[in-house]
Amino acid sequence: MAILVTGGAGYIGSHTCIELLNADYEVVIVDNFSNSNPIALQRVQQITGKTIKVYEIDLLNELELERVFQENSIEAVIHFAGLKAVGESVVNPLLYFEKNLISTISLCTVMQKYNVKNIVFSSSATVYGLPETLPITEDFPLEVRNPYGRTKRMIEEMLHDVYISDSSWSISILRYFNPIGAHESGLIGEDSIGIPNNLMPYITKVAIGELKELNVFGNTYETSDGTGVRDYIHVCDLANGHVAALKKTIEMNEVGIFNLGTGRGYSVLEVLRAFESATSLTVPYKVCDPRPGDVAIYYADATRAFKELGWKAKKSLEEMCKDAWRWQLNNPNGYLKRKKQSTSSK
Ligand code: NAD
Ligand code: UD1
């Protein structure tokens, strides 16, 4: 029996494939490489010494997708594929409803047809909106503020309805906080295209000299040093969270929602200082206006994942910084030969 990983060539997907292979799962990948490169998958195989089966298919193509279910004994699906750029989703919401929501409908329809009813879904902490208290538990009220977040919430709700209609489904919804870092080999990592929107890839691009300085978005928030606080989680810890969730999804028939975070927050300046100390580099920065729509503080209560999945994040901020830097240094142009131009970068 194999695990189908949609979007398996992407940032989180490729790291998760390593942990799945290390745990002796057979892995089949469906990816259209719209925001990734097949080289990532060669490197996953190089790191693990194991082989994976790869289909270059767009999830919206149901007929092609059926072929994957016909040719393999799929036991469960980990569903990463989708677009993730918040700003792009505001400009082009229909693209996001098509590529995230419709493609998930297509996936679940095919799963149902082939009687594969175990799914682990990549959601996001973005579904919580503005938290009134901290840390954020899974039963906090949801409030989405952009089309990207709305697609995540709608998919979560859709999966609930699917379960209500047929309780032989088993569904794990994973709400990620802020994944950063890279595999310690330095062979795979986050292949940001253009100017990154997110903090860690921006820092590494300043450190390598590709960008001049970090723009710190605001220093008057009600936080220890006035800069925004987030729950950064090492991508390999996150990947392991998927293996833990997968086991539970296969064993049980229920809908589970889990925060995947470390449970502690770091400010922008704390991350910057940690990066400098982990790499012995100096990263220039300047303070700018706050980014519209940003929340001051955001961090997870990850107790449920520990109690019910037996999972918790282990890696330190220092390891996240060191690994992010190793990836950047060894791969200044990411995966180099990009196969197709991306439609999405966060
Ligand atoms: P990514 O862009 O690196 O990976 C997504 C993968 O899906 C890519 O390989 C892309 O080519 C593929 N893909 C996209 N649309 C497809 C389609 N229609 N058919 C087939 N393949 C398709 O993104 P990531 O950072 O690895 O994120 C994975 C998932 O986790 C996404 O659903 C994202 O919304 C979610 N998420 C990510 C973050 C984050 O900070 N990276 C945070 C919260 C949630
Ligand atoms: C982003 C996503 C969100 C996703 C989350 C987790 C956006 C708008 N939001 O939010 O949907 O769920 O990641 O992966 O992309 N910062 C700077 N300078 C920079 C970049 C960031 O100061 O150049 C600050 C931000 O103001 C914030 C912190 O760094 O305080 C983290 O920012 P970022 O990495 O973009 O993550 P989120 O804001 O949490």
Predicted region positions:
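Short, flexible, glycine-rich and Lys/Arg-enriched loop motifs at helix boundaries
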Residues: P38, N178-N198, G209-R230
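Short-chain dehydrogenase/reductase
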Residues: F97, R145-R153, G189, I193-N197, ...
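C-terminal substrate-binding subdomain of Rossmann-fold SDR/epimerase-dehydratase oxidoreductases
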Residues: Y202-K346
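Residue-level signature of the cytosolic catalytic core of signaling kinases
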Residues: I57, N61, I195-P196, R264, ...
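N-terminal Rossmann-like NAD(P)+-binding domain of SDR-like oxidoreductases, especially those catalyzing
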Residues: M1-A182
